[in-house]
């Protein structure tokens, strides 16, 4: 994978709190459908209330026992996953045509950013070509799900910081029965700062690096403001 050369695209970053999944999904769709070749790219950093999402390739049988947790069928690639408190979710609305990126390279760059983020904690993450995401000793620590429309991507990644992993026992994570799932909090020494703020800051820095954004062209919208389309 070649790291992107610096470019002059404006990037808008929103660090949000807990956002309803359907609200974020509709907003991503609206921005992607209405953006122009001159529109800035966007990255949203947030978390969701507990929810299962089933991608376009998802099968109901992988929802083994959803219980009272809502299930939403969505337009991203991939199978079933869980989102909830304790995750760092990053949604990427990027103009791939402007960057000259294909889908495979997009996935590889996101995975590289996650792996580099884990490296700050002394955690060795790896990617698997047959199952997108990032893994530590065979257990999944980050999931990817993307959609490309009109040459632009949306959706993104979910990195497990310190969530209750019990919800993953109710599904076949990403469509793989028996897949183990892990989190940063279980892989670092006691007392390590694994706050969401720290993980988000590290992840954002690595995303800027792998996609070649000029830090001077990054604009933050504020701590809790939800951007309009």
Regions found by a protein language model. Name each.
Residues 90-92, 132, 144-146, 157-161, ...:
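A structural signal for short, well-ordered beta-strand segments
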Residues 56-63, 144-161, 165-166:
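Short, conserved beta-strand/beta-arch hydrophobic-aromatic motifs that form part
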Residues 154, 166-229:
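C-terminal accessory segment of soluble enzyme catalytic cores
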Residues 61-64, 90, 151, 162, ...:
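Residues at secondary-structure transition points
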Residues 1-141, 170, 190-197, 224-229:
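N-terminal lobe of the biotin/lipoate ligase/transferase fold
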């Amino acid at each position: 994978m070649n790291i992107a050369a610096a470019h002059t695209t404006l990037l808008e970053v929103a660090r949000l709190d807990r956002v309803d999944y359907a609200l974020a999904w509709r907003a991503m769709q609206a921005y992607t459908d209405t953006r122009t070749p001159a529109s800035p790219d966007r990255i949203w950093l947030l978390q969701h209330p507990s929810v299962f999402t089933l991608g376009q390739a998802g099968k109901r049988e992988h929802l083994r026992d959803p219980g009272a947790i809502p299930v939403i069928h969505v337009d991203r690639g991939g199978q079933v996953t869980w989102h909830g408190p304790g995750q760092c979710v990053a949604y990427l609305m990027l103009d791939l045509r402007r960057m000259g990126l294909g889908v495979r390279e997009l996935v590889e760059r996101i995975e590289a950013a996650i792996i580099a983020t884990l490296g700050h904690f002394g955690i060795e993450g790896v990617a698997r070509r047959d199952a997108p995401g990032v893994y530590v000793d065979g257990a999944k620590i980050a999931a990817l799900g993307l959609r490309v429309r009109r040459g632009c991507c949306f959706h993104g990644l979910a990195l497990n910081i310190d969530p209750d992993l019990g919800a993953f026992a109710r599904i076949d994570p990403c469509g793989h029965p028996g897949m183990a799932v892990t989190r940063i909090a279980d892989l670092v020494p006691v007392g390590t700062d694994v706050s969401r703020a720290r993980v988000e800051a590290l992840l954002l820095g690595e995303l800027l690096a792998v996609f070649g954004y000029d830090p001077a062209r990054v604009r933050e919208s504020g701590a809790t403001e939800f951007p309009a389309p």
